[in-house]
Amino acid sequence: MTLRSDEEIAAARIGPPEIHNSTIYLAPYDPEWSRLFEREERRIRAALSDRALLIEHAGSTSVPGLSAKPIIDIVLAVADTTDELAYVPAMEAAGYVLRIREPDWHQHRLFKGPDTAVNLHVFTIGCTEIERMLFFRDHLRSDEADRTLYENTKQELARRTWKYVQHMPTPNQG
Protein backbone atom coordinates (compact mmCIF):
# COMPACT_ATOMS: atom_id res chain seq x y z
CA MET A 1 0.00 0.00 0.00
CA THR A 2 1.45 3.36 -0.95
CA LEU A 3 0.59 6.78 0.35
CA ARG A 4 -1.96 8.51 -1.83
CA SER A 5 -2.10 12.11 -2.99
CA ASP A 6 -5.07 14.33 -2.08
CA GLU A 7 -6.29 13.98 -5.68
CA GLU A 8 -6.09 10.17 -5.60
CA ILE A 9 -7.94 10.02 -2.28
CA ALA A 10 -10.68 12.34 -3.54
CA ALA A 11 -11.04 10.38 -6.80
CA ALA A 12 -11.52 7.07 -4.98
CA ARG A 13 -13.93 8.41 -2.33
CA ILE A 14 -17.66 8.42 -2.69
CA GLY A 15 -18.41 11.74 -1.04
CA PRO A 16 -15.80 14.15 0.29
CA PRO A 17 -12.76 12.76 2.12
CA GLU A 18 -12.86 13.08 5.89
CA ILE A 19 -9.98 15.23 7.14
CA HIS A 20 -8.31 13.77 10.25
CA ASN A 21 -5.24 16.00 10.93
CA SER A 22 -4.30 14.11 14.06
CA THR A 23 -2.35 11.20 15.40
CA ILE A 24 -3.78 7.69 15.21
CA TYR A 25 -5.16 5.93 18.29
CA LEU A 26 -4.00 2.34 18.66
CA ALA A 27 -5.94 0.28 21.19
CA PRO A 28 -4.45 -2.70 23.01
CA TYR A 29 -5.59 -6.03 21.57
CA ASP A 30 -9.20 -6.80 22.52
CA PRO A 31 -10.62 -10.35 22.17
CA GLU A 32 -14.01 -8.70 21.49
CA TRP A 33 -12.71 -7.87 18.00
CA SER A 34 -13.05 -11.50 16.89
CA ARG A 35 -16.63 -11.61 18.20
CA LEU A 36 -17.44 -8.39 16.33
CA PHE A 37 -16.04 -9.95 13.16
CA GLU A 38 -18.21 -13.04 13.66
CA ARG A 39 -21.31 -10.86 14.04
CA GLU A 40 -20.46 -8.92 10.87
CA GLU A 41 -19.74 -12.15 9.00
CA ARG A 42 -23.26 -13.38 9.84
CA ARG A 43 -24.73 -10.05 8.70
CA ILE A 44 -22.82 -10.20 5.39
CA ARG A 45 -23.82 -13.84 4.78
CA ALA A 46 -27.46 -12.98 5.51
CA ALA A 47 -27.30 -10.11 3.00
CA LEU A 48 -25.41 -11.88 0.21
CA SER A 49 -25.96 -15.60 0.78
CA ASP A 50 -23.92 -17.56 -1.78
CA ARG A 51 -22.71 -14.35 -3.46
CA ALA A 52 -20.26 -14.01 -0.54
CA LEU A 53 -17.55 -16.35 -1.84
CA LEU A 54 -15.06 -15.61 0.94
CA ILE A 55 -15.30 -13.64 4.19
CA GLU A 56 -12.16 -13.28 6.31
CA HIS A 57 -11.12 -11.20 9.31
CA ALA A 58 -7.96 -9.35 8.24
CA GLY A 59 -5.87 -6.46 9.47
CA SER A 60 -4.40 -5.89 12.91
CA THR A 61 -7.62 -6.62 14.82
CA SER A 62 -7.38 -10.20 13.51
CA VAL A 63 -3.96 -10.80 15.12
CA PRO A 64 -4.14 -11.81 18.81
CA GLY A 65 -1.90 -9.64 20.96
CA LEU A 66 -1.42 -6.87 18.39
CA SER A 67 -2.54 -3.31 19.08
CA ALA A 68 -4.70 -1.76 16.37
CA LYS A 69 -6.95 1.05 15.33
CA PRO A 70 -10.19 -0.37 16.76
CA ILE A 71 -11.68 -0.91 13.30
CA ILE A 72 -12.55 -4.41 12.13
CA ASP A 73 -11.06 -5.06 8.67
CA ILE A 74 -12.99 -7.67 6.72
CA VAL A 75 -12.12 -9.11 3.31
CA LEU A 76 -15.10 -10.08 1.17
CA ALA A 77 -14.68 -11.81 -2.17
CA VAL A 78 -17.48 -11.70 -4.73
CA ALA A 79 -17.64 -13.03 -8.29
CA ASP A 80 -16.90 -9.62 -9.85
CA THR A 81 -16.51 -6.34 -7.96
CA THR A 82 -17.34 -4.36 -11.08
CA ASP A 83 -20.83 -5.95 -11.13
CA GLU A 84 -21.99 -3.72 -8.28
CA LEU A 85 -25.67 -4.52 -8.85
CA ALA A 86 -24.92 -8.08 -7.70
CA TYR A 87 -23.91 -7.02 -4.19
CA VAL A 88 -24.06 -3.27 -3.44
CA PRO A 89 -27.87 -2.97 -3.04
CA ALA A 90 -27.93 -5.96 -0.67
CA MET A 91 -25.05 -4.56 1.37
CA GLU A 92 -26.71 -1.14 1.54
CA ALA A 93 -29.98 -2.78 2.64
CA ALA A 94 -27.98 -4.41 5.46
CA GLY A 95 -26.77 -0.96 6.53
CA TYR A 96 -23.32 -0.84 4.93
CA VAL A 97 -22.27 2.32 3.08
CA LEU A 98 -20.07 2.21 -0.04
CA ARG A 99 -17.34 4.79 0.59
CA ILE A 100 -14.46 3.97 -1.77
CA ARG A 101 -14.28 2.71 -5.35
CA GLU A 102 -10.76 2.08 -6.67
CA PRO A 103 -10.86 0.76 -10.24
CA ASP A 104 -7.08 1.14 -10.58
CA TRP A 105 -6.25 -0.90 -7.46
CA HIS A 106 -7.60 -4.44 -7.85
CA GLN A 107 -11.11 -3.05 -8.51
CA HIS A 108 -11.28 -2.58 -4.72
CA ARG A 109 -14.46 -1.38 -3.04
CA LEU A 110 -14.72 -0.36 0.61
CA PHE A 111 -17.86 -0.22 2.71
CA LYS A 112 -18.23 1.20 6.21
CA GLY A 113 -20.21 -0.86 8.68
CA PRO A 114 -23.69 0.01 9.91
CA ASP A 115 -23.15 0.07 13.67
CA THR A 116 -19.60 -1.14 14.27
CA ALA A 117 -16.32 0.41 13.17
CA VAL A 118 -15.81 -1.82 10.12
CA ASN A 119 -13.81 -1.49 6.92
CA LEU A 120 -15.27 -4.06 4.53
CA HIS A 121 -12.81 -4.57 1.66
CA VAL A 122 -14.43 -6.13 -1.41
CA PHE A 123 -12.38 -7.83 -4.11
CA THR A 124 -13.08 -10.21 -6.97
CA ILE A 125 -12.47 -13.83 -5.98
CA GLY A 126 -8.92 -14.85 -6.89
CA CYS A 127 -7.53 -11.33 -6.55
CA THR A 128 -3.87 -11.41 -5.51
CA GLU A 129 -4.49 -8.72 -2.88
CA ILE A 130 -6.69 -11.14 -0.93
CA GLU A 131 -3.84 -13.65 -0.85
CA ARG A 132 -1.38 -10.95 0.23
CA MET A 133 -3.60 -9.65 3.03
CA LEU A 134 -4.30 -13.12 4.42
CA PHE A 135 -0.66 -14.20 4.13
CA PHE A 136 0.41 -11.11 6.09
CA ARG A 137 -2.24 -11.76 8.76
CA ASP A 138 -1.21 -15.40 9.10
CA HIS A 139 2.48 -14.49 9.22
CA LEU A 140 1.93 -11.98 12.03
CA ARG A 141 -0.14 -14.56 13.92
CA SER A 142 2.69 -17.10 13.75
CA ASP A 143 5.90 -15.03 13.96
CA GLU A 144 6.34 -13.28 17.29
CA ALA A 145 9.50 -11.40 16.26
CA ASP A 146 7.89 -9.91 13.16
CA ARG A 147 4.69 -9.17 15.09
CA THR A 148 6.75 -7.21 17.65
CA LEU A 149 8.65 -5.36 14.91
CA TYR A 150 5.36 -4.51 13.17
CA GLU A 151 3.80 -3.36 16.45
CA ASN A 152 6.76 -1.09 17.24
CA THR A 153 6.67 0.40 13.75
CA LYS A 154 2.91 1.01 14.02
CA GLN A 155 3.34 2.72 17.40
CA GLU A 156 6.01 5.00 15.94
CA LEU A 157 3.92 5.88 12.88
CA ALA A 158 0.78 6.40 14.98
CA ARG A 159 2.47 9.29 16.79
CA ARG A 160 2.72 11.24 13.51
CA THR A 161 -0.03 13.61 12.42
CA TRP A 162 -2.06 12.20 9.52
CA LYS A 163 -4.28 14.33 7.28
CA TYR A 164 -6.41 11.31 6.37
CA VAL A 165 -6.96 8.07 8.22
CA GLN A 166 -5.58 5.61 5.72
CA HIS A 167 -3.35 2.62 6.08
CA MET A 168 -0.04 3.81 7.44
CA PRO A 169 2.94 3.08 5.18
CA THR A 170 5.12 0.07 5.80
CA PRO A 171 8.62 0.88 7.09
CA ASN A 172 10.13 0.99 3.58
CA GLN A 173 7.45 3.42 2.35
CA GLY A 174 8.58 6.23 4.62
Residue spans of the language-model regions?
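Active-site nucleotide-donor binding segment shared across nucleotidyl transfer reactions
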Residues: 43-85
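Short amphipathic alpha-helical segments
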Residues: 22-24, 70-74, 116-118, 136
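Charged phosphate-binding loop/patch that engages nucleotide di/tri-phosphates or the phosphate backbone
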Residues: 159-174
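Metal-dependent nucleotidyltransferase catalytic core
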Residues: 29-44, 78-114
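Short histidine-centered catalytic/ligand-binding loop motif
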Residues: 25-33, 76-77, 135-140
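A residue-level signal for conserved active-site and pocket-lining positions in enzyme catalytic cores
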Residues: 73, 150, 168
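Helical scaffold of the NTase/Pol beta-like nucleotidyltransferase catalytic core
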Residues: 1-56
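Conserved, surface-exposed functional patches that form binding/active-site neighborhoods
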Residues: 100-154
